[in-house]
Structure formats: structure tokens, C-alpha cells
């Protein structure tokens, strides 16, 4: 069979022949125009990356056996290590969140055997035993792999039942050990095995697990935490494990792994990484590095600036604190909330701003340009930051307009640097110009420069804090919650704010979740499939319900790429499966919990709110304009990932169900022991019992006014509460005091009104007509029943010889009887009573 461009030919179709690589184009080697092998070298490999063509297969193997990715008969797993798939996946930029179509097909070709075996737990265990030793890529991040390992060979796992951490899944099977490349400089014991599969690091205690429907989990044995990496195969092939924060913690990561944050100067790196305690670090930052801007690197999104804070009051220069009615009181309330949540002393590191402010000063909106010597420190040019264009930062002659960032990935230009693998960008000239940029100056929060600063105030998307245990947390002003970001500062410099971009995906026991302040589980992600996983929809075509049909759907020709046009990509999937995308989004939106406005939250008047258009002008909902149906936590993560500065929550704190923390303790750095901190957090989590936390919210819904706080940080409860959310809900009012008792006058007629207060003693029962003994009493009624019953209605008129004048006179008399005024009109004489009927003995009828 002839070869094309020196590469192997296209594999056979799905289901034909042994080791088929999927549909047309799946698993095939990319052409030379798509993958420039000569321009890219895989870091850490000793052998040449150029593969040897093997006729008849898309994956280069020695003695082919089984599906792509299976180990050869010799036991040396060199098929993927020296194959084109590893070379292709090594070129994914760290800023990109999703894989392209070619990279997606390469991931599917390697994981095809595991996908087809994902029918039952028994089948998955047999697959892990049969393919033990196989090395499979994790997609993102580069340099991490899954080594297929039977459970009996996993040290320390034992009889752990992962279904206790994920009750929704019918079965979860541990199938592989997570390993990664090692930097020989960080670990001299590796030696010559740095570029060999045997030199991979497996000391992190991370294991890969698969559940029903190809749900992918990462199990952290040390912390007993189950992390949801992907909800289905399509999400796993598209995003990989790049959202798992735990992967970036190891300090022995190789040079081929995603690069970490490039600090401005080596002295600042030493200050952050070698600080023995938070107190000394805080003094050093305030003395020398206050106002310095750091280009923070977060996997899966573009660079964003983080301004190091010298004092907590500096946050008043950023939104949403600057526009608050009283910024100082709001900052006091937020500081009080952080004391209650962290239960120890803490240090404010910096404020994370949107990416458009990178290269501009981060301060009040003065609109003036500050010279380089005004404030701040001189920084070094960071390689690989072309998406943010550091070449025109503050202090240079060229200014940069704020660049909006759309879909993840975009047209990022990445260049090789000391801390990253080599990647070929779309424009080599622009990459070379970015790499050769002169050193820049980052100006602190005392001045403003650049067109992004004119007339606007930067918004703090996150406030990074460091507690006494060395863990890094992020306070989110969008929803007022505190989220864990990293276990230590070195981990934070590699993972960035990734912990806030994947909320609700970590499940741990109650004690572990309380110790690490893990957010609540996102039930929408753990218990429901993805809304855009259309091949799992109940109304999808019948052929898409089998594994082979789903495989053909995911890897069909010309499916498209969701990076550039996600709407067209989803519309194509919906048409293929016979679904209406607008209907699917509308149904999923209706299943989300409705918004809630607290009873003590003051609403804006209707004339200050944006009125919806009349029904005649409302357009039909379209999938291109509808917002994605995301849960509350997923919506916050989406806003933080794409720097949505106009995002507002839909709900406020539930006043009746929220838990109010009354702890007023003030913790000082260095005065608490680690065991005491853990005990305080566990005690508060036990008292809260999973309820929502009553907290200050700097950003409130659109129809509400901002919260107000006292100088001590306590919220001011308004005297005039808002109306209930639902019209049919009965409002609660204070009970009015009862009237004083009045002199009783026995009426001739039964009472017409209900008595709400304490009244005179009840009247003796009247003798009923027709009674013989005169001792029959009326039925007794409870006091509650008397208050709830309505007054009896007047009897219907009898149209005999009565006239309209008589009826009017009777109605007027009844109205006067119901009047409660002191002056009563004399009543007319009562009509004569009818004669009493003679009582007769009952007749006995004999049948």
C-alpha cells in the first residue's frame, strides 16, 4: 500500500479488521503541513521523535496487537512513546483549553479500546488486566500519562469503595496510575531514564478511575478525594485532565510539562518560594514588592495580571469595592468573613485582574501615564506570553489596546522558553517579535497608563490570600465565596487560579472538605450529563445509543472544531442526531433552580429596572443568542475564565435557610497551631450542616440595591422589607393588638362578626325549637375555629308579597347590626314568631 508524504496510510473503517483505528481520519498520521515534525522537538526524550511507518495501521507499532495504544508483545511500551500521537499532543499550548479536531482524533485513537470496553465494571477490570503496562496520554496537560495498572498492583488502595464519594455512579473501577515526566535537574536520581517510560514519576499517589458512561475520575489517595475529570468520553477527548488542579502540585515536574508563572525577578521568586512563614513573607512583600504586577499563568486561559498588595485597604481602588456605598465598611465586612472562614491569621497576596489589563497599570481611573520611575519594579520579559502581548507594556513607547479574549485557545502565539516545551505558533514573525521584546516596567496601583485604563476602574476578579497552613485561597467578589486555589505557593505558581475555574468537582469526606474549605458539590455536574452531550440525550437517534454508534458520531468526518465556532459545532451535532438545539437548551434551563431574592434585600423600583419587551416584540429564542444552561457554580467559573466583568448573580442569600456565623474572633498570624485551625473549621462545618453561608456580596443581582454595612462589618437590615418573590405567597405581618373589651349587650340575632380578641363570656345556650327538655346545647367550637370562620350570610329573600322597599329596609337593618359604632339605631320590632308545632310521638313502621 502506498504511503502519503512519508506517513502511514489511513486506517480501515470502524469495526473492520483487527485493531481498527476508528472512522476515516481517526488515528491516522497528520500530514507534514499540519504537524511540522522538524520544527518541534519533544523535551525529555533521548530517542528521535521521527516514527517509522508501519503499513496498514494509523498508529506506529512494533508487532501490532490489539487496538491502538496496546503494548507490544515484547513488553516495551514504545508504540505511543515514539508514535505521532505523542508528538502531536505535545504541541498543545498551555493557554488553550480544548483540543483541535486533529488532536481530538489522536486522543480517541489511543483511548478507543478503553471506550469500547466501558460496558460494565467487570469488563473494565478485564481490560486493565489484559492491557497492563499500556501508557495512555491525558491530553492536557502535556507530560502526564495514565499507566494501565490492575487494582491488585496499586499500593495503598486496598478495598476502597469510590462509590461512597460518588453515589450517583453504579460502578467505578480504578484502571491506571497517573505518572508524569521528571526534570533531571530537580531529581538527579533519574539519570539517563529521563527520556524513557521507566523514568516517569509515580509518587504523587494519583490514580485514574472510569465509571459508567465513560465518566473519568482522578483519585487522590493521600487526601481521599475523588475529582471528576470528565463526564463523558467526548469531554475527555476534548479537554483531557487539564482542569484537575492536583496534577500541578508535584515539585519534580519535567521541563516538558506546562510552564509555571514567570516571576519578574529571581529575587521575588526566592521571596515567595523560600518564605518559612506567612508573617515574614508579608513583611517582605510590603517592604519591597508592593504594587508589583505578576503575569499569572493559569492552564486553560490566557495570562492575567496579579497586583501584589501592600495593605488590605488598597482593594478600595478596584471594583466592585470602589463603587460600593461605603467601600471601607464593605472591606471590613469581607475581612470579617475571611476571618470566620479561614479560622486563622491570613495574608492578602494580591488582586487578580482581567487579562485586558496586562501591560497597563492597575489603579484608580486617572487616565494619566506614569513614568517608569514612579512606582513598581523593573521586570523581565516573559517568553510564551504572546497572547497578552507584553511588548507594549507600561514604560515602552508602544501602547496596547485591551484585547478581548473569546474562545479558549484562539490564535495564540507561543514561543519556546526555559520553562515550557517548544510550540510552533501561527505566526513565527510575531512570535519572534514577542520573544525579543525589551524589558518592561509594571507600574503599581498608584497611577494609570494605557488605553485600557482611560475612564474605567479595573475589576478585581479574585483576591488571593495565604493562610497560616501555607494554603492559597481566593476570595471571589462575584459571589462572595472563598475557594481553595493551591496547597502551597509553588503549587499556586503552576496552577494559577485553576481551582476557581472548575468549582464543585471535588468530592471528599466531611472532615477533609472542612479542613480544605472545599466548595459544595455541583449536583448539576455530578448527577446529570452535560447539556451539550447531545449523543446522550434521551431523544437522540437510536443508532447513537450503542458504543459503536457513539464512536462513529464523535469521530465522523467534518464534524468541526468547537474552538472557533462552538454554536455551529453544536448545531451540526443536533442535526446529525435529529434534535432541536434551542429546545434542548430551553428544557435544560427550566430544570435549573429558580432565582431567589432575600426578604431583607431591597429591590429597585420598577422604573429603574430594564423592562422586558412586550410579547408582540419578543423574538423567538435562538441557540446562538441564548445563554448556556449552567448551574450557579459553573456560571461563576465561566465568568472567571472569560473575564465577564458584567456578570451578576441571579440569587441572593436565603435569609431563612442561610447559616449566620457569629464568631467575632480576630486571629493574628503565627498564634494558631495547625491542629487548632483544623478543629475550628471542622466545628463550624458541623454546625452549618451543609447550609448556605450568610456572607457579604459585593456584587448583587441586577434588580437589587447594594448591601450596606456598619463600620464593624455587620450588615444593615432595612426597615422596609421587599415584597415576596411569588405573588401567590402569603406575606407575613406582625399580629395587631386586640381591642379592649366593651360592655356586652345581648343581641336578639346571632353575631355577624368574628371576635379576634378576648371578649365577654359566652352566652348560655338557647333552647332549640322543637326540643322537649330545653337542655340541648349548641356544638362547641375551638377558639382557632372561631377566628377562621366567616360571618354567616343573610338568608335568601322570599319573593312573595314583599316589595323592593321591604328588601331594602331589611338590608339596611342588617348593615346596622354589623356596625361596631357605639351609637346604634333603634331596631324595628321583631316580626311575630310562628306558632310552635305540637310534638308527636315517633311512628313505628313495621315491615
From Swiss-Prot:
Compositionally biased region (Low complexity): 26-56
Ranges of Acidic residues composition bias in the record: 723-733
Subcellular location: Virion; Host cytoplasm; Host nucleus
Keywords on record: Host cytoplasm, Host nucleus, Host-virus interaction, Inhibition of host innate immune response by virus, Inhibition of host interferon signaling pathway by virus, Inhibition of host PKR by virus, Interferon antiviral system evasion, Transcription, Viral immunoevasion, Virion
GO cellular component: host cell cytoplasm; host cell nucleus; viral tegument
GO biological process: symbiont-mediated suppression of host innate immune response; symbiont-mediated suppression of host PKR/eIFalpha signaling; symbiont-mediated suppression of host type I interferon-mediated signaling pathway
Keyword Signal included in the entry's annotation: no
Compositionally biased spans, kind Basic residues: 833-847
Region (Disordered): 1-82, 607-627, 715-847
Quaternary assembly: Interacts (via N-terminus) with the viral DNA polymerase accessory subunit UL44. Interacts (via C-terminus) with host EIF2AK2.
Function field: Acts as a transactivator along with IE2, and is required for oriLyt-dependent DNA replication in the transient transfection replication assay using native promoters.
Protein's UniProt name: Protein IRS1
